[in-house]
Curated annotation (Swiss-Prot):
Belongs to the GHMP kinase family. IspE subfamily. HAMAP family: IspE. It comes from the Bacteria. Its EC number is 2.7.1.148. This is 4-diphosphocytidyl-2-C-methyl-D-erythritol kinase. NCBIfam families: ispE. The lineage of its organism: Bacteria, Pseudomonadati, Pseudomonadota, Gammaproteobacteria, Pasteurellales. One of its GO terms (molecular function) is ATP binding. The keyword Metal-binding does not apply. Keywords: ATP-binding, Isoprene biosynthesis, Kinase, Nucleotide-binding, Transferase. It is an enzyme of class 2 (transferase). The gene is ispE. It comes from Mannheimia succiniciproducens (strain KCTC 0769BP / MBEL55E). Pathway: Isoprenoid biosynthesis; isopentenyl diphosphate biosynthesis via DXP pathway; isopentenyl diphosphate from 1-deoxy-D-xylulose 5-phosphate: step 3/6. Catalyzes the phosphorylation of the position 2 hydroxy group of 4-diphosphocytidyl-2C-methyl-D-erythritol.
Length: 302
C-alpha cells in the first residue's frame, strides 16, 4: 500500500483484484492506572484507549479450499503462533466455515512498542474475515473470540475509543479530544512481564470514576519503573516533555507527546535524534477499519 496514514487512502486502495486491504490501526493508552493485583496474577487496570490514523495493512484474498496462508514469515515466530493465523483459525472453528484465506501483512508498527500492533492485526483478521466469509458473528461474539488472543484485542474489535477496567474486559465507549501525536520508539525492547513483576511498580492507585479521570492530568503507572529500567526511555521522555505533555503508552517502549495540530507535532518529531524511529498521527475515536467496513457495506447495499 502507498500510505500508512489511513485517512489519505483512496476507496480504490481497499480493493485490488480479488484482494481486500484492511487497516490495522495503532492505539495509545492516553492514561493507564494499576489498581491492584488479583490472586490469578492479573493486574486490575483503568486505562483509556484511542486509535491512531496510522498502522499496518492486512491484505486478504478468500480461498475455497479452507487453507490459511500468511506472508511474510516473521523470524523466530512459527506461523501457527502468529496472532493473525490464530485469529483466522479461531473464526473457522467457531463458525465451521469451510473457506480459507491468503493473508499478507504490510507491517510498519513496531513489535512490543505499546501501540497495539499484534492485537490490532488479530482484531482486523477477525473482523475482516467475518465480513468476507459472511460468518455473521456479532461484534460482541468477535470480541469474545479476540479475548482468547489477547487482552487488548476486544478494544480493536469494537472499534471505538474506550475506557477499559478490570483486566480490560469492562469497556465503556468514550470520546476524548482527537489530538495530534508524535510517537517515538527508543531502541529498546521492553518485556511487559518484566515491568509488571517489578517490585517498585505502583499497584495501588485508587479507582476513580471515568468523569474524574478525564478531568485530571493523564499519567501512566508503568512509566516510573520503565524509566528506571531503561535509561533510553528516561532520556527520550526528559527531552520530549520540554516541548509538550509526554508519556509512555502501555508498558512501552513507545512514548508520545500531544499537540493541538499536525504542524506542531511534525516540527517536534523532526527534531528527534536520527537513532529513533516513529511517526506522527492524529487520534481517532472510530477505528479506520470500521470506517472502511461502513463504506464497503454502503457500496454493497447502494
Amino acid at each position: 500500500m502507498k500510505t500508512h496514514q489511513f485517512s489519505t487512502a483512496l476507496f480504490s486502495d481497499y480493493k485490488q483484484g480479488d484482494s481486500f486491504n484492511f487497516p490495522c490501526p495503532a492505539k495509545l493508552n492516553l492514561f493507564l492506572y494499576i489498581n491492584g493485583r488479583r490472586t490469578d496474577g492479573y493486574h486490575e487496570l483503568q486505562t483509556l484507549f484511542q486509535f491512531l490514523d496510522y498502522g499496518d495493512w492486512l491484505s486478504i484474498k478468500v480461498r475455497n479450499d479452507g487453507k490459511i496462508r500468511l506472508t511474510p514469515e516473521i523470524p523466530d515466530l512459527k506461523t501457527e503462533d502468529n496472532l493473525i493465523y490464530r485469529a483466522a483459525k479461531l473464526l473457522q472453528q467457531k463458525t465451521a466455515c469451510r473457506l480459507g484465506a491468503d493473508l499478507h501483512l504490510d507491517k510498519v508498527l513496531p513489535m512490543g512498542g505499546g501501540v497495539g500492533g499484534g492485537s490490532s492485526n488479530a482484531a482486523t483478521a477477525l473482523v475482516a474475515l467475518n465480513y468476507l466469509w459472511k460468518t455473521g458473528l456479532s461484534v460482541n461474539e468477535l470480541a469474545e473470540l479476540g479475548l482468547k488472543l489477547g487482552a487488548d484485542v476486544p478494544i480493536f474489535v469494537h472499534g471505538k475509543a474506550a475506557f477499559a477496567e478490570g483486566v480490560g474486559e469492562k469497556i465503556t465507549y468514550c470520546e476524548p479530544p482527537e489530538k495530534w501525536y508524535a510517537v517515538i520508539k527508543p531502541n529498546v525492547s521492553i518485556s511487559t512481564a518484566k515491568v509488571f513483576s517489578e517490585p517498585d511498580l505502583t499497584r495501588d492507585t485508587k479507582k476513580k470514576p471515568l468523569e474524574q479521570l478525564l478531568q485530571q492530568e493523564y499519567t501512566n503507572d508503568c512509566e516510573k519503573v520503565v524509566r528506571k529500567l531503561y535509561p533510553e526511555v528516561e532520556e527520550l521522555l526528559r527531552w520530549l516533555v520540554k516541548y509538550a505533555p509526554s508519556r509512555l503508552t502501555g508498558s512501552g517502549a513507545c512514548v508520545f507527546a500531544e499537540f493541538a495540530d499536525e504542524q506542531s507535532a511534525q516540527t517536534v518529531f523532526n527534531l528527534k535524534s536520527k537513532q529513533f524511529s516513529g511517526f506522527v498521527a492524529q487520534g481517532l475515536n472510530v477505528s479506520p477499519l470500521h470506517k472502511m467496513l461502513e463504506q464497503l457495506n454502503r457500496q454493497n447495499h447502494g
